[in-house]
């Protein structure tokens, strides 16, 4: 698949060169630069590229060459449609809100979600955990569940949706708290302003933290964990 993607990228680059512009092919995220970024891949590739591009303030458009293409604008058979889009200097750019996760002073950005999950080990009992949440310092609720998801509007169609969360349109000025396999059927998702800051009271023993599916670390009662909108 890498060879197919490379040949497609070379063909797109040739069209861009023919239009009088410069095109550079990248295979590593650390190499990314330029005014527009075209990503050939699935949602995993889009997530990694978008987070890197956001640091550089580069707009991203994706073509689905992977398994899932929720985040990509075009499917494989629509590849050529990306050319006039990236050449149009007046094309609309949709900005997506991201999470900034801070764990004991270390910061991580998430485009989809932060997941706090109870670790499952073959030699230990599997029990639910209790997580208390404060919004801007005020107690907002206590969740008894296998874990908790903090989702952006972009991530509302991913893990959060599978856990029973609501779908939010990309322009919503909200984030969403969704319990994972909640102990009580009355425990539901909470939508809150993305201008607010979340803080957590975590149980004894470590929870596992994942940002967009990537392991971030572990956190427990002695750790300080906050989530806010990334600037």
Predicted feature locations:
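Proline-centered loop/turn at the N-terminus of a beta-strand
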Residues: 57-61
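Gly/Ser/Thr-rich active-site loops/lids in small-molecule metabolic enzymes
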Residues: 143-186
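ATP/NTP phosphate-donor binding region
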Residues: 1-36, 40, 48, 52, ...
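Catalytic core of DAGKc-family lipid kinases
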Residues: 68-146
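Short glycine-rich anion-binding loops that position phosphate/pyrophosphate groups of nucleotides
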Residues: 42-45, 68, 154-156
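A residue-level signal for conserved active-site and pocket-lining positions in enzyme catalytic cores
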Residues: 38, 64, 114, 213
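A generic structural signal for short beta-strands and their flanking turns/coil linkers
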Residues: 95-99, 110-112, 127-131, 146-148, ...
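ATP/nucleoside-binding phosphotransfer catalytic cores, i.e., glycine-rich phosphate-binding loops
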Residues: 108, 116, 122, 135-139, ...
């Amino acid at each position: 698949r890498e060879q197919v993607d490379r040949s497609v990228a070379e063909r797109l680059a040739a069209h861009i060169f023919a239009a009088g512009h410069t095109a550079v092919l990248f295979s590593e995220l650390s190499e990314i630069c330029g005014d527009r970024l075209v990503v050939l891949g699935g949602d995993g590739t889009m997530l990694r590229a978008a987070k890197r591009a956001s640091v550089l303030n580069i707009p991203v458009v994706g073509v689905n060459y992977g398994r899932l293409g929720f985040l990509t604008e075009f499917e494989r058979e629509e590849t050529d449609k990306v050319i006039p889009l990236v050449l149009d200097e007046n094309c609309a750019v949709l900005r997506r809100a991201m999470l900034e996760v801070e764990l004991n002073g270390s910061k991580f950005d998430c485009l989809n979600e932060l997941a706090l999950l109870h670790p499952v080990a073959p030699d230990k009992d599997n029990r639910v955990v209790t997580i208390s949440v404060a919004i801007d310092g005020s107690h907002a609720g206590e969740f008894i569940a296998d874990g908790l998801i903090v989702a952006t509007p972009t991530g509302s169609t991913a893990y959060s949706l599978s856990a029973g969360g609501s779908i939010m349109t990309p322009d919503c000025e909200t984030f969403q708290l969704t319990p994972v396999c909640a102990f009580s059927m009355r425990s539901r998702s909470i939508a809150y302003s993305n201008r607010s800051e979340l803080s957590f009271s975590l149980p004894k023993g470590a929870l596992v933290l994942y940002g967009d599916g990537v392991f971030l670390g572990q956190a427990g009662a002695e750790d300080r964990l906050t989530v806010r909108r990334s600037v």
